[in-house]
Amino acid sequence: MTEAPDVDLADGNFYASREARAAYRWMRANQPVFRDRNGLAAASTYQAVIDAERQPELFSNAGGIRPDQPALPMMIDMDDPAHLLRRKLVNAGFTRKRVKDKEASIAALCDTLIDAVCERGECDFVRDLAAPLPMAVIGDMLGVRPEQRDMFLRWSDDLVTFLSSHVSQEDFQITMDAFAAYNDFTRATIAARRADPTDDLVSVLVSSEVDGERLSDDELVMETLLILIGGDETTRHTLSGGTEQLLRNRDQWDLLQRDPSLLPGAIEEMLRWTAPVKNMCRVLTADTEFHGTALCAGEKMMLLFESANFDEAVFCEPEKFDVQRNPNSHLAFGFGTHFCLGNQLARLELSLMTERVLRRLPDLRLVADDSVLPLRPANFVSGLESMPVVFTPSPPLG
């Protein structure tokens, strides 16, 4: 690409077009803080993203993280100290011990999902393995019964549609219906946990207290919604997109099978490569010049996490999928005060499923090696919509 890309960074089709990374490459080389055809500013280099995240007093979350929508009443759209208090309250459900305690149940769930397809010799990796796993894990934490998981998956997809791109009136209504249903379900769950606490996440959040403060029912609804969306879509897309790269780079697949100790590094490379959260916005609190571009108070600047993860100044041969990449300081979980609260849980899910796929479906392969797999046209969280795979049938464990 020799000319400035003529793109709309708020249009989900840009992220599904397979042209985004070439556009990012031009931005990083020529205009680290780029303006799209509509004037939206975007930080494209690793250093620009980091520099913005290190100055939350100048680059604020409080105006909303989406380019064309106002802030929502959840901690991701807050600055400190309000954000820090809310984060401390929610963090009670994501301590290292609570995540570690879920390992056995997540491992069993991975085997159950593989059991459901292993005798067939074929499946859609997204539909049958990548999508059900995080939804089941998050669903269990939010009090969702197994028979309700498909319903929750639909709600999550519908709600992310609203946050992800230009939406039609029909899509807007679908989103509002999904939120109303989620709101009713969650308020009923909150009431039940107040009356009869269990060990699930909702019970922990209901009883969480910091400096005498507790979460109200309204706050519980919004923060569990953030957990649902963040915990479902991101892990799903990393698992599917990362596995796609292992299958397209067979030497990396074979390397992991020979040496499973490389799996932690492979998970980090899957996260870097897929960068499921494509971007977030920050609002300027003052006029400034930033990496060569004049910015005005009140405007939004997009942080292009995916572009930062492919910055040649930071990552050697960034277009090469390398499970032994070291160092690998990717920004898939963000950076700074808003670093992803669920990163330990996501890494655990990715590791447990990938280890089992490598071991139980050792000759897993794409149905068509040269196929271009469809990406979700979304400007926030995006990844593969479908990935047909085949493998040698094997008996289930259960």
Curated annotation (Swiss-Prot):
User: What CDD domains does the database record attribute to this sequence?
Assistant: CYP142-like (cd11033)
Name any GO cellular component annotation: peptidoglycan-based cell wall
Please state the pathway this protein functions in, per its UniProt record: Steroid metabolism; cholesterol degradation
Q: What does it catalyze? A: cholest-4-en-3-one + 6 reduced [2Fe-2S]-[ferredoxin] + 3 O2 + 5 H(+) = (25R)-3-oxocholest-4-en-26-oate + 6 oxidized [2Fe-2S]-[ferredoxin] + 4 H2O; cholest-4-en-3-one + 2 reduced [2Fe-2S]-[ferredoxin] + O2 + 2 H(+) = (25R)-3-oxocholest-4-en-26-ol + 2 oxidized [2Fe-2S]-[ferredoxin] + H2O; (25R)-3-oxocholest-4-en-26-ol + 2 reduced [2Fe-2S]-[ferredoxin] + O2 + 2 H(+) = (25R)-3-oxocholest-4-en-26-al + 2 oxidized [2Fe-2S]-[ferredoxin] + 2 H2O; (25R)-3-oxocholest-4-en-26-al + 2 reduced [2Fe-2S]-[ferredoxin] + O2 + H(+) = (25R)-3-oxocholest-4-en-26-oate + 2 oxidized [2Fe-2S]-[ferredoxin] + H2O
Kindly report, in one word, the top-level EC class recorded for this enzyme: oxidoreductase
- Reported function: Involved in the utilization of cholesterol as the sole carbon and energy source by degrading the side chain during infection. Primarily catalyzes the sequential oxidation of the terminal methyl of cholest-4-en-3-one into (25R)-26-hydroxycholest-4-en-3-one (alcohol), (25R)-26-oxocholest-4-en-3-one (aldehyde), to finally yield the carboxylic acid (25R)-3-oxocholest-4-en-26-oate.
UniProt family annotation: Belongs to the cytochrome P450 family.
Its recorded name reads: Steroid C26-monooxygenase
